[in-house]
Regions:
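Beta1-alpha1 glycine-rich phosphate/pyrophosphate-binding loop at the start
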Residues: 4-68, 72, 151-165
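FAD-binding core/adjacent interface of flavoenzyme oxidoreductases
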Residues: 1-9, 67-154
């Protein structure tokens, strides 16, 4: 697809949901690009249940929810281009994509940024020093648990988001 109607940057929950809704509404072609090799964003690393309660009215693990969202977007007609990065956008709206098929320029009608949540490193928050051994961010902990790596036996949880429980 050389010139999509919409180029969605980010294949996490928001990007996949937007692609689905746009395709269902007849806005085609919709192309979703993501630098990761697998669609789904942060939920891919969350093995706990609770995903899908609001929109699907059932509880799923994060990876299952991510697969569901990707399949739904594709089923509606969206095209997923994974392992693909937007290297730049010119003033006229031409986007340079770099991925497994090489370098490609596309001129979408609209670029929708859905780049999601990212944990900021300490330096970005102006906190000096290194993280002590055994201190995990939420994302790190979820990745270790998903990979079945040992994370310790005692924990102190700082925070109140739903993954803290």
């Amino acid at each position: 697809v050389n010139d999509p109607a919409v180029l969605v940057v980010g294949a996490g929950p928001a990007g996949l949901a937007a692609a689905h809704e746009l395709a269902v509404a007849g806005v085609v072609p919709v192309v979703v690009v993501d630098r990761e090799a697998t669609a789904g964003g942060v939920p891919r690393h969350c093995v706990h249940t609770g995903f899908g309660l609001q929109d699907l009215h059932r509880s799923m693990t994060g990876p299952a929810y991510a697969r569901h969202l990707a399949a739904r977007a594709i089923g509606a007609g969206a095209v997923l281009r994974l392992s693909t990065t937007v290297a730049g956008v010119t003033p006229d709206g031409t986007a340079t994509l770099v991925g497994p098929s090489g370098i490609e320029e596309v001129r979408p009608g609209v670029i929708l940024l859905a780049t999601g949540a990212r944990e900021r490193p300490r330096s970005a928050r102006l906190v000096p020093g290194d993280r002590p051994a055994g201190v995990f961010t939420t994302g790190q902990l979820q990745q270790w648990v998903l990979a079945d790596l040992p994370v310790g036996r005692r924990a102190v949880v700082v925070g109140a988001e739903h993954v803290a429980y």
